[in-house]
Amino acid sequence: MMEWFYQIPGVDELRSAESFFQFFAVPYQPELLGRCSLPVLATFHRKLRAEVPLQNRLEDNDRAPWLLARRLLAESYQQQFQESGT
């Protein structure tokens, strides 16, 4: 299900929540992420597994998987703070 994600060059080298946010250029507050990195990454993982990127061969964009993963990570981060009221 997540093959598309693991095909993004460099993804297999990410080891921390901060490294994911830096790699995908998603803005975050370090003090907030430090408190909720596990729930954010768990939500991100669920979203990645649920998402099946559509491949439009007419508009082949090499960055499409990276852009999709970036959006899902940002959504996961925002969702954590909406749920916790922070």
Curated annotation (Swiss-Prot):
InterPro entries: NifW. Pfam families: NifW. Keywords: Nitrogen fixation. GO terms for biological process: nitrogen fixation. It comes from the Bacteria. The keyword Ligase does not apply. May protect the nitrogenase Fe-Mo protein from oxidative damage. Belongs to the NifW family. Homotrimer; associates with NifD. This is Nitrogenase-stabilizing/protective protein NifW. It comes from Klebsiella pneumoniae. The gene is nifW.
